[in-house]
Design a protein with these regions (language model features):
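Amphipathic, hydrophobic N-terminal targeting peptides for secretion and organelle import
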Residues: 1-9, 196-202
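Hydrophobic ligand-binding cavity/cleft-lining segments
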Residues: 3-83
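Beta-strand/loop substructures that line and gate deep hydrophobic ligand-binding cavities in soluble
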Residues: 3-5, 116-171, 176-178, 187
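Phosphate-binding glycine-rich loops and adjacent basic patches that engage nucleotide phosphates
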Residues: 17-26, 88-93, 129-142
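Phenylalanine-focused residue identity feature
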Residues: 23, 59, 95, 114, ...
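Short, flexible segments with low predicted structural confidence
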Residues: 28-32, 101-102, 141, 148
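General secondary-structure edge motif
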Residues: 38-39, 83, 110, 145, ...
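Glycine-rich portal/gate segments that line the openings of hydrophobic small-molecule binding cavities
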Residues: 42, 50-52, 63-125, 138, ...
Length: 202
C-alpha cells in the first residue's frame, strides 16, 4: 500500500474515532450542543400509575432527593430550597452513565417540574403530577425532548432516545410506588399497634 493510501486510511480511522467519541460524550451528557439545527420535538408519556399511599407521602418521596433528604441516591443536589432546586441526575444506560443537570420546581403536594440545563439532549421539559383518589394517589408523568440534526435527530429520538428515556422513567415510577406503599403500610401498622396499646391502657 502506497504512502498516500496509508495516510488516508489513518485519517479516516481518526475521523471515525472522533465521531464515535463525540457521540458517546453527547450520550453521556459530557458534551452539550444546543445548535437548534433541524430540531425535532418528541413527546414523552403520558405514563400513569396508581399508588396505594396518600398523596402527601408520595410527594415527599418524589421530592426528597431535591430537598437533601435522600441518601444513596443517583442524584446530586447542587443548589436549592423548598421550592426550587438544581440537581445532576446520573442514569445508567447500557454500558455508560448519562449525566443530566436540571432545574426542579417543587409545588407541593401536586406537582414536580423539570427543566433541562445540560445533558444528552439540548431540550427537555418534564412534569410529575399527583392526584388524590380517595386517600390513594395517581402519579402521572409527561414531557418532551428536543433533538437537533434533522433526519438523524428524528430517527435517534424515535428509536433510541425516547424509548431509553421512558424506560428510565418507568423504573423511577416503580421505585416511587414501591417505597411509598412500603412506608404507608408501615405507618398503618404503627397506627394500629398504637391504637391497641391505647385500648389496653384504657
Amino acid at each position: 500500500m502506497s504512502a498516500p493510501w496509508i495516510i488516508a486510511a489513518a485519517l479516516g480511522l481518526l475521523l471515525l474515532v472522533l465521531v464515535v467519541g463525540a457521540f458517546l460524550m453527547l450520550a453521556m451528557g459530557r458534551l452539550h450542543l444546543d445548535l437548534g439545527w433541524g430540531r425535532s420535538v418528541h413527546q414523552l408519556g403520558p405514563i400513569t400509575i396508581g399508588i396505594e399511599a396518600p398523596r402527601k407521602l408520595v410527594f415527599e418521596i418524589v421530592a426528597a432527593p431535591y430537598l437533601g433528604r435522600a441518601s444513596g441516591s443517583d442524584i446530586d443536589l447542587l443548589a436549592g430550597d423548598e421550592r426550587l432546586a438544581v440537581a445532576a441526575h446520573h442514569t445508567k444506560v447500557h454500558f455508560y452513565t448519562a449525566r443530566t443537570v436540571e432545574v426542579i420546581e417543587l409545588d407541593p403536594p401536586g406537582r414536580v417540574g423539570f427543566r433541562h440545563i445540560t445533558g444528552p439532549v439540548p431540550h427537555a421539559v418534564e412534569e410529575f403530577t399527583l392526584s388524590d383518589l380517595d386517600g390513594e394517589t395517581e402519579l402521572r408523568y409527561e414531557g418532551e425532548i428536543g433533538i437537533d440534526f434533522f433526519v438523524l435527530g428524528r430517527l435517534a429520538g424515535r428509536h433510541w432516545v425516547r424509548p431509553q428515556w421512558e424506560r428510565g422513567v418507568r423504573r423511577h415510577l416503580d421505585s416511587v410506588k414501591r417505597g411509598a406503599e412500603e412506608r404507608a403500610a408501615s405507618q398503618e401498622r404503627r397506627s394500629r399497634a398504637g391504637g391497641r396499646r391505647d385500648s389496653a391502657a384504657g
